[in-house]
Swiss-Prot record:
One GO molecular-function entry: metalloendopeptidase activity
Family named by the database record: Belongs to the peptidase M36 family.
Residues annotated to bind Zn(2+): 429, 433
Induction trigger: Expression is controlled by the prtT transcription factor.
Propeptide boundaries: 19-245
Catalytic class of the enzyme: hydrolase
Cofactor(s) needed by this chain: Zn(2+)
Name this protein carries in UniProt: Extracellular metalloproteinase MEP
Signal peptide: 1-18
Enzyme Commission numbers on file: 3.4.24.-
Residues the record marks as active site: 430
The organism of origin for this protein: Neosartorya fischeri (strain ATCC 1020 / DSM 3700 / CBS 544.65 / FGSC A1164 / JCM 1740 / NRRL 181 / WB 181) (Aspergillus fischerianus)
Keyword annotations from UniProtKB, A to Z: Hydrolase, Metal-binding, Metalloprotease, Protease, Secreted, Signal, Virulence, Zinc, Zymogen
């Protein structure tokens, strides 16, 4: 579950952090703790300074050899005995670095958590790479030939029983689909769509390889990939959850919540370079409501999974102006304003991210990609005042080509209640789950932020982007920001500490993670480090307070947007399920690729200040901190 608050019980009452109640679907976490089944961080990341293996003499530059061929050649050199396939989601980022992803195979089946990502520079040489390929003994194919494993229905029933899923499988049957040992289930009730199963291998925690069924079940509040042992039909080896917990009268971009300004009317606010069909068309149909190529926003008071026929305001004159006051009650009385605010914030963020490199080929959320690459049919489903919970929000990120799903809730910690759609930081935080999940490991793989530390960084990226966007013209290095303060009606916000460059106000360092086991708490540490990076870059390059960056040769000219750009580029470089050290290296590599490394000193100083210096070492049980800045970078 990737939501705003779940598992982050640092300051608010327990009720605020409980899993949202759902009227029909949902996993009872008090009985089954999905964190116990999180994937482990297996990857090694070789950064740009460590990639010293020169291309062999037979190597041809880009013009003669494609970047896919160059990357494939590199994988064969590093893992000569491995069999693998190229994942069909490779692309060249707007910084000129190509990203190619590979999946290891065995006996014709995927090893689902064995990945290799290769980043190829403009010169056609390998820039950096991540590797979690399995190096142990590959099982004999005899078990497959003899079909010495359970049938898919047994796997579905085992998954349902072990995780106590609220679905009915008594009449379940399986039908073969395209692909080796791929099935869809019929006769199942309680799911959004028909469950699926694929026979795959999975690297277990003990380093051995298990034949498993990957069972996919979307129960709305949780969209799960469960790896259940194919022989026993009972033992679960890992679980991935895709869910992260005209004229428009709105709080304009940069106003985080009603305490920071008044609503205004904005006209045709889209960026035509990012939203070529505007926000209210998908290239084939022009809409007169909160629907378009990037998102579809509606009310969802019952908390169900249907959305196309849900209520959304309509205006034949395209004048989306509706009354709202923070003192109004109940929230349903201003649902029109809520839907339009959510639609506006999500679309504006889509356009900004597009400018910063999260475009169609990188796996962004668009119904019609207009021939620009990537897979379409995946705008974001935006549910305002979703009835499946309160005091939270969440975002589901399936692979590219399937819609993202954001649920915004009403917050009940104040009188009158407050609507989370009016706090932009919450919307941005949730949407950033989609950004980081699509970029890390590639658009086709949504499994790469499911280890505890990488999941924590997923929360931290959301907080960082939300905080960077709300900076004001008069802000200085000494300015502190909280998260979720307005919606939760809590002056100190919903995190353990405010985001601050003061070690007195916020003392978090890398070794703080040793005592943390919740993703939101870990994310606060990561976002604190990124806040330091941003202010170091602002001190060097200044701060652009406009809603969009000024680019020179693709590089933001100011420190705020440069920090955001490097963070985004780093996501695409880092390996599957990265740790803090690897994500730090990816940001440093992003600077090398984008600027030639002119900001290495500022970035290293920021991380070193918070204990993630050159000598920092990752261990899931005992992280070692360091304040060392490498010699020669400053």
């Amino acid at each position: 579950m990737r939501g705003l608050l779940l598992a982050g019980a640092l300051a608010l009452p327990a009720s605020v952090f409980a899993h949202p109640a759902h009227q029909s679907y949902g996993l009872n976490r008090r009985t089954v703790d999905l964190n116990a089944f999180r994937l482990k961080s297996l990857a090694k990341y070789v950064n740009a300074t460590e990639t010293v293996i020169e291309a062999p003499s037979s190597f041809a530059p880009f013009k003669q050899q494609s970047y896919v061929e160059a990357a494939t050649q590199h994988v064969k050199m590093i893992a000569p005995d491995a069999t693998f396939r190229v994942v069909d989601d490779h692309y060249v980022g707007d910084n000129g670095v190509a990203h190619v992803h590979f999946r290891q195979t065995a006996n014709g089946l995927d090893i689902d958590n064995a990945d290799f990502n290769v980043n190829v520079g403009k010169d056609g040489k390998v820039f950096s790479y991540g590797n979690s390929f399995y190096t142990g003994q590959i099982p004999s194919s005899a078990a497959l030939t003899k079909r010495d494993f359970s049938d898919p229905v047994t796997a579905l029933k085992g998954t349902t029983n072990t995780l106590q899923l609220p679905i009915t499988v008594d009449s379940a049957s399986s039908e073969s689909t395209e692909g080796k040992e791929s099935y869809v289930f019929k006769g199942v009730s309680g799911t959004v769509s028909d469950p699926k199963a694929n026979l795959v291998y999975f690297v277990k925690d003990d380093g051995t390889l298990a034949l498993t069924w990957r069972v996919e079940t979307d129960i709305d509040s949780n969209w799960l990939l469960t790896y259940i042992d194919a022989k026993s039909g009972e033992q679960i080896h890992g679980v991935v959850d895709y869910v992260a917990e005209a004229d428009y009268q709105v709080y304009a971009w940069g106003i985080n919540d009603p305490t920071e300004g008044e609503r205004t009317v904005v006209k045709d606010p889209w960026d035509s370079a990012a939203s070529e069909f505007t926000w209210i068309s998908d290239g084939s149909t022009k809409y007169t409501t909160s629907r378009g190529n990037n998102g579809i926003a509606q009310s969802n008071p019952n908390g169900g999974s249907s959305y196309l026929n849900n209520y959304r305001p309509s205006s034949s004159s395209l004048s989306f102006k509706y009354p709202y006051s923070p003192s109004s009650s109940p929230p349903s009385s201003y649902i029109d304003a809520s839907i339009i605010q959510l639609f506006y914030t999500a679309n504006t963020y889509h356009d900004l991210l597009y400018t910063l490199g999260f475009n169609e080929k990188a796996g962004n959320f668009e119904y019609n990609t207009n021939g620009q690459g990537g897979r379409g049919n995946d705008y974001v489903i935006l549910n305002a005042q979703d009835g499946s919970g309160t005091n939270n929000a969440n975002f589901a990120t399936p692979p590219d080509g399937q819609p993202g799903r954001m649920r915004m809730y009403v917050w009940t910690e104040s009188t009158p209640y407050r609507d989370g759609s009016f706090e932009a930081g919450i919307v941005i935080h949730e949407y950033t789950h989609g950004l980081s999940t699509r970029l890390t490991g590639g658009p086709a793989n949504s499994n790469c932020l499911n280890a505890l530390e990488s999941g924590g960084m997923g929360e931290g990226w959301g907080d960082f982007m939300a905080t960077a966007i709300r900076l004001k013209p008069g802000d200085k290095r000494s300015t502190d920001y909280t998260m979720g303060e307005w919606a939760a009606n809590r002056p100190g916000g919903i995190r353990q500490y405010p985001y601050s460059t003061s070690m007195s106000t916020n003392p978090l360092t890398y070794t703080s993670v040793n005592s943390l086991n919740a993703v939101h708490a870990i994310g606060t540490v990561w976002a604190t480090m990124l806040y330091e990076v941003m202010w170091n870059l602002i001190d060097k390059h200044g701060k652009n307070d406009a809603p969009k960056p000024t680019l020179r040769d693709g590089v933001p000219t100011d420190g705020k947007y440069l920090a955001m750009k490097l963070v985004i580029d780093g996501m695409a470089l880092q390996p599957c399920n990265p740790n803090f050290v690897q994500a730090r290296d990816a940001i440093l590599d992003a600077d090398t690729a984008l600027t030639g490394g002119e900001n290495q000193c500022e970035i290293w100083k920021a991380f070193a200040k918070r204990g993630l210096g050159a000598g920092a070492q990752y261990s899931s049980r005992n992280r070692v901190g360091s304040t060392e800045v490498p010699s020669g970078v400053c």
